[in-house]
Amino acid sequence: MLSRNLKTLVKNKNILYFTTSTSKSNKIYENAKEAVKDIPNGSKLLVGGFGLCGIPENLISAVRDTGVKDLTVVSNNAGVDDFGLGVLLKSRQIKRMISSYVGENATFESQYLKGELEVELTPQGNLAERLRAGGAGIPAFYTSTGVGTVLVEEGGFPIKYANDGSGKVEIKSEPRPTQLYNGRKYCLEESITGDYALIKAWKADTRGNLVFRNTARNFNPPMATAAKITIAEVEEIVDAGEIKPDEVHVPGIYIQRIVKGPSFEKRIERLTVQKEKTGEAAAKPKDEAAAKRERIVRRAALEFEDGMYCNLGIGMPTLASNFIPKGIRIELQSENGLLGMGPFPKMGEHDADLINAGKETVTTIPGSSIFSSADSFAMIRGGHVDLTILGGMQVSGNGDLANWVIPGSMVKGPGGAMDLTSSGSRVVVIMEHTTKHGKPKILKNCTLPLTGKSCVNRIITELAVFDVVNGKLELIEVVDGQTVDDIKSKTEAEFTVSKNLKPLQQVEI
């Protein structure tokens, strides 16, 4: 008779069934060091997380301690200088990064521009889908994201610079094959798989089933499916059966190793909380720059219509949600995996596992839902988001947008903007009318690498509002105190003037 502490095995027509057990699973490792010690030089690692939210911090530190080198690391972000993947960059164990947005890591930017690091930037939604496809055995897929851009379709974007300071490009991105479907062009993207995946979950059972907490889910599920060996760092391990089957986020078939982390720093990149209402802010006069931004944002808020699903970009676009008109109800979608984003939390109620796409702490609302980055971009790519509001560096007269890179000096990455601009949702770009040097930002042709081609529907600045109609600009609103000739002097692109030209509209406060 079998011991009560062992699994009871029942054989029925060549199918093995296991009853409950208190025995130790062979997937559970004593510590992170043991779980990663066999990772060899030159491995390809898939690392979960979004910013610093949901990163496998103990596994990353353990990889650093092994001294393994020449790694190719696939991750949405590159951490910060002294935390997350930043520690592997600092120790120079990474040869190539495949990422979407790396704007928070100065070490990353410096190594890339000096030719010390290979960097393959990819749109965030493409990254999520390439991983999902890799885990599903799909070698490649077609997408409209990146059509008409040097980063995706055209190729030629620098992957590696020479390390002699010359600025010469040694490795460039390859152009993508294209195909027309129903008259629309699509690019072929290859899937991504890895040797090892390092992911972070909230809870695991002894069979490897995983549960994530809030937006710490993000890229972890697609990463988990796409590797030969997936190592999950968790906060709690429970016996099989304690996680109900319909509560499992990632089934144990994808997980080979489990480690319970001894502690978690869970650093927050942007702790953002509600400001106390004292009345002082209303009485304090705004400086000119703040007044410009508020004027832009208050006009942008008039784009909201009742019942809309909206995605707001980082910076000024996010502020538009502070001015939603009375009687209008919208749901905010955040590409890191949240639908129904609430306001910033009160001080002391913030949660490191609950952030928005700008890495700011947020809350949920009744009816919110949380999902993986792959599901998030399926919503976006599928055209289920009604309105996208983005910032811009340049917009052309035919609606091209550039907002993600200044070659040779600023490397942020495209993030989710390329996916959002190609999704078929209405795209509104908000920005100041000119640069800080007074040069136009609305141009005949963008001079910076494009985010999207012919994708902008409306441009809102502190001076004017333009619609893009059949590939041409039409001026529809002008701020009081400015004439059409004033706008022409500050706008390089040609435009027509609406017969119903109005003053610049503002939402009521």
Swiss-Prot record:
Pfam families listed in its UniProt record: CoA_trans (PF01144)
Going by the UniProt record, its keywords in alphabetical order are: Mitochondrion, Transferase, Transit peptide
- Reaction catalysed by this chain? a 3-oxo acid + succinyl-CoA = a 3-oxoacyl-CoA + succinate
A biological process from GO:
ketone body catabolic process
Q: One GO molecular-function annotation for this sequence? A: succinyl-CoA:3-oxo-acid CoA-transferase activity
What's the chief localization of this chain?
Answer: mitochondrion
> Has UniProt tagged this entry with the keyword Acyltransferase?
no
One GO term describing the cellular component: phagocytic vesicle
Q: Where is the active site?
A: E335
User: EC number(s)?
Assistant: 2.8.3.5
Q: Which NCBIfam families match?
A: pcaI_scoA_fam, pcaJ_scoB_fam
In Swiss-Prot or TrEMBL terms, this protein is called Probable succinyl-CoA:3-ketoacid coenzyme A transferase, mitochondrial
